[in-house]
A protein has these predicted regions:
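AMP-dependent adenylate-forming
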Residues: 8-34, 49-60
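Conserved AMP-binding/adenylate-forming
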Residues: 28, 45-99
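Conserved ATP-dependent adenylate/AMP-binding module captured primarily in the ANL superfamily
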Residues: 62-68, 100-131
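Structural motif
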Residues: 73-75, 98, 119-123, 141-143
């Protein structure tokens, strides 16, 4: 492999030590193999929905982005999985600090114009009113809360 990506590194580690624990959150433990599989499935889902690179780097100015942007509003161990999944799909993951006020998140999302938003279900209600209407994909990640998904997720 001429160039290594973070996704390729994860997959190589998963091949070498599939049952080694990668993340721990409360009682939940995820192995490298589980994480590699989860990130592959999410990356494929994003790609299947048309997310990825639309203009290659060589055709862009330094300040331009030729990839779709996905905002991540998350708070636990599945956050790195979603970052890696976005990178595998060649999508730009952008962290949105869930400690921000809804107004601050709204301003950030307006600036970013993300094509998709991945959020933990417990955070959905807090930011429902400021999520971008132009987002074509809204993914709710189960975080053990009893809250319902937002409409369209």
């Amino acid at each position: 492999m001429a160039e290594w990506t973070l996704g390729a590194v994860l997959d190589a580690i998963a091949d070498a030590v599939p049952d080694r624990v990668m993340t721990v959150s409360g009682e939940r433990r995820s192995t490298y193999a589980q994480t590699a599989e989860r990130t592959r499935r999410v990356a494929n889902f994003l790609a299947h929905n048309g997310f990825g690179v639309h203009t290659e780097r060589a055709e862009l100015q330094n300040w331009e982005c030729g990839q779709d942007v996905v905002a991540l509003i998350m708070h636990n161990d599945l956050y790195p999985d979603m970052v890696l999944a976005c990178l595998k799909a060649r999508v730009v993951p952008v962290n949105v600090n869930y400690h921000y006020t809804p107004r601050e998140v709204g301003e950030l999302l307006e600036y970013l114009s993300p094509r998709g938003v991945i959020y933990h279900r417990a955070l959905g209600a807090k930011f429902a009113d400021v999520l971008p209407g132009g987002a074509q994909l809204l993914i709710s990640v189960d975080d053990g809360s009893d809250l319902p998904e937002l409409p369209g997720a």
